[in-house]
């Protein structure tokens, strides 16, 4: 379930996505992948645990139990992988993001957004990734959490899997391919 516009136009608010959780099928997480991950360091507010015990709540709990809906207590996010271990990511020279000194073409960025309004110069640590939303003006991603314990990076151990498609609403169903960040 996509609750915000942080990944527009790749993903829309209220889209339901299919996630490949099998590492031997999905392979290594790489630049350009759209991934689901558990909140690495309090990026999100605490989940509301005061739900009333209604039939709707019980149905939702059942769908969470069988894996159709995400567990709200686990606080999942969806972002695009921009950098992997060892990458030096710098923003922004001439309104371009660079990875390892190479300017990046980002066709997926929401129209009218710059790569970032926040400047940064980060080298991704081993076992971590740097993530950003496609709608940069509406995404509190790695850039906004550089002062947390992970320096805004997401440990690979927190990654649930790679998004491979939108499955609902049905008229919006589509594949979500990885888009190479570096050519």
Give the positions of each predicted feature.
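Aromatic-capped interface at the extracytoplasmic side
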Residues: 1-7
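Soluble "head" domains of membrane/secretory-pathway proteins
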Residues: 9, 13-183
